[in-house]
Regions:
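Active-site core segment of subtilase-fold serine proteases
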Residues: 140-143, 147-263, 283, 289-318, ...
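C-terminal region of N-terminal signal peptides and the immediate post-cleavage residues
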Residues: 24-47, 252
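Active-site alpha-helical elements of protease catalytic centers
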Residues: 188-191, 195, 224-268, 277, ...
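Autoinhibitory propeptides
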Residues: 36, 42-43, 60-63, 67-166
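Extracellular S/T/G-rich loop segment that most often corresponds to the catalytic His/Ser-adjacent loop
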Residues: 334, 359-445, 449, 457, ...
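C-terminal subdomain of the subtilisin-like protease fold in secreted/lumenal serine endopeptidases
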Residues: 40-47, 81, 293-300, 447-501
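Secretory targeting and sorting signals
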Residues: 1-35
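Substrate-binding/access-modulating region of protease and related hydrolase catalytic domains
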Residues: 187, 269-376, 419-434, 485-486
Length: 501
């Protein structure tokens, strides 16, 4: 991941077809103009004996075609780690150098595309036999707290004895969450999936709002596991901080979240090395759809590429697989908020990527084009969130781009929950996105009849229209657009009060 860059390592809400038994070549990408430069290739050519992870995408998303893909994987020297027949995606591992070519030959017309999900050898190797489409085993290990994906390290804040720190939460006032709470704190029927590094289940400001029954670990090869403790945080407080912003409990202690009475599921998609690989995110979105979640928060980009390019076969196959999972979740009623990212670039003008692949000994300087996207934030079906400061300026680190940013939210020096019952300040678009997830949760609480498309339309319409101004420290590309829609704030700053009316 680089959590936005959460090490952890953040489009439009063009809703996916509600019917997933479709020919999924339709989740394809826009062709590049003839004069557009090709993106820099990143060859992934492991020698025999190197275990790699792959997505294998069926030409049609149905159980019969997916079963053909599974058989092709096995016949080609691969192991089926996880099957998602609802979207026609199989996660496989293989130590055969020619696996991609062989599986396409064996699978024939049943397979649309195959792509490696990483450039490095798999650490989470799957060797056991898995029941078809069922969860596997997993575990977790204690580790040191790691910073994520461009987000600043946590600055711990002393907590007073049973004191509320609401007065320090300027961010809640900025989005009118405090006023919204006079109408509702949210409904217990609303469930938010926090796709992240795990949520501390012992924190006094979180424990009451965590749904253990809906929490899961997706970091064992992309296979969902509800083994005890698997979804706990291990090497990062990132998910715990995000969770507090979404739904910190109102209890007179510490902080209060945007939607303090909704429930959250910890959907762990960040491994102990700080990576969110595609198969983990696919598992997270599929789990959210299958468990009937209403909202997900995604404060990360999917590793190992900050931008995934549709003119590179491996990257294109991965984008297709992740897109299918996002589309599936939308078809099941899920609205997903995502961090725009912390590289300070304008999506419309950026032509280089020097951070990828981040699982290699060293990243390379890549040329990218308009067909290269930051995922999941730039995928259809995802609400993209930029970050602003307490003064209302675009945060210096925030990505931007006219037609790419949906809304803006506070993301600089945000006070929230951290590990071991503590509180801390973090900055990043990772901190902005959970404000929007919380607002969406409040909206769903007040208006349970709304569909995902209607929720996104209302979120945009309700946002406080904000004209262009200088970014923090005058950093990065200047603002482009109108008061109604621009590259910094999108449709405006999210408004919790209007969301519940």
């Amino acid at each position: 991941m680089r959590l936005t860059k959460m090490r952890f390592p953040a489009r439009r809400m063009a809703l996916a077809a509600a019917t997933l038994g479709l020919v999924v070549a339709g989740s394809g990408f826009t062709a590049q103009a003839a004069e557009a430069p090709s993106s820099t290739p990143v060859p992934i050519n492991p020698p025999d004996g190197t275990v790699m992870s792959y997505v294998v995408n069926a030409a049609q998303a149905n159980p019969g075609q997916t079963r053909k893909v599974e058989l092709a994987v096995t016949a080609s020297g691969g192991v089926v780690v996880q099957s998602w027949p609802a979207i026609g995606v199989v996660i496989a591992q293989s130590d055969r150098a020619a696996f991609r070519e062989n599986v396409k030959t064996v699978g024939k017309t049943s397979i649309l595309s195959v792509g490696a999900t990483r450039t490095a050898e798999v650490g989470d190797k799957i060797t056991g036999v898995q029941l078809p489409w069922g969860p596997g085993a997993s575990g977790w290990n204690k580790g040191k707290n790691k910073p994520v994906n461009g987000d600043e390290p946590t600055t711990l804040v002393p907590a007073g004895p049973a004191d509320s720190q609401e007065s320090q939460q300027w961010d809640m006032a900025q989005i009118n969450a405090d006023k919204a709470h006079a109408i509702t704190d949210g409904s217990r029927s609303v469930l938010v999936g926090v796709l992240d590094s795990g949520i501390d289940p012992t924190h006094v400001d979180l424990a009451a709002n965590i749904s253990v029954a809906d929490s899961v670990n997706c970091t064992q090869g992309g296979r969902p596991s509800q083994a005890a403790g698997g979804w706990y945080p291990t090497t990062s407080d990132h998910g715990t901080h995000v969770a507090g912003t979404i739904a910190g409990v109102r209890n007179g202690v510490g902080i209060v979240g945007v939607a303090p009475n909704v429930r959250m599921a910890s959907v762990k998609v960040v491994n102990d090395d700080g990576y969110i690989y595609p198969e983990y995110a696919i598992c997270g979105f599929m789990w959210a759809g299958q468990r009937g979640m209403d909202v997900t928060n995604n404060s990360y980009y999917i590793d190992p590429f900050e931008f995934w390019c549709d003119d590179q076969p491996d990257q294109a196959a991965v984008r297709d697989a992740v897109s299918r999972a996002v589309n599936y979740s939308v078809s099941k009623g899920v609205v997903s908020a995502a961090a725009a990212g912390n590289s300070g670039v304008d999506f419309n003008t950026n032509t280089t990527d020097s951070a990828s692949p981040n699982d290699a000994p060293a990243p390379i300087q890549r040329t990218i084009n308009a067909g290269c996207k930051d995922i999941p934030t730039q995928l259809p079906g995802v609400v993209t969130v930029s970050s602003i400061t307490q003064a209302g300026q675009l945060s210096s680190f925030s990505n931007r781009g006219l037609g790419h940013i949906d809304v803006a939210a506070p993301g600089s020096r945000i006070l929230s929950t951290t590990l071991n019952g503590k509180y801390g300040l973090k900055s990043g678009t990772s901190m902005a996105s959970p404000h929007v997830a919380g607002v969406l949760a409040l909206m769903k609480s007040a208006h349970p009849e709304l569909t995902p498309a209607q929720m996104v339309a209302k979120l945009r319409a309700d946002a406080t229209k904000t004209p262009c101004s200088a970014a923090q420290n005058n950093s990065g590309a200047t603002c482009d657009g109108t008061t109604e829609l621009n590259s910094y704030y999108g449709y405006g700053v999210v408004d919790a009060l209007k969301a519940v009316k």
